[in-house]
Amino acid sequence: LRNVEQQCRADALVERAQELIHGQQ
């Protein structure tokens, strides 16, 4: 079930990216 692990990491990266985007605005 490494796919789940990768998906969780991807979700975390997306959340960080969204935070950075909101922070710039």
From Swiss-Prot:
Keyword Lyase on entry: no
Catalytic activity: Endohydrolysis of the N-glycosidic bond at one specific adenosine on the 28S rRNA
MF (Gene Ontology): rRNA N-glycosylase activity; toxin activity
Further comment: IC(50) of translation-inhibiting activity is of 400 nM.
Keywords, ordered alphabetically: Glycosidase, Hydrolase, Protein synthesis inhibitor, Toxin
Keyword Hydrolase: yes
Residue stretches in coiled coil: none
BP-aspect Gene Ontology terms: negative regulation of translation
Source species, domain of life: Eukaryota
The name this protein goes by in its record: Ribosome-inactivating protein charantin
Enzyme nomenclature, EC number: 3.2.2.22
First-level EC class: hydrolase
Assembly and interaction partners: Monomer.
Source organism of this protein record: Momordica charantia (Bitter gourd)
Function: Inhibits cell-free translation in a rabbit reticulocyte lysate system.
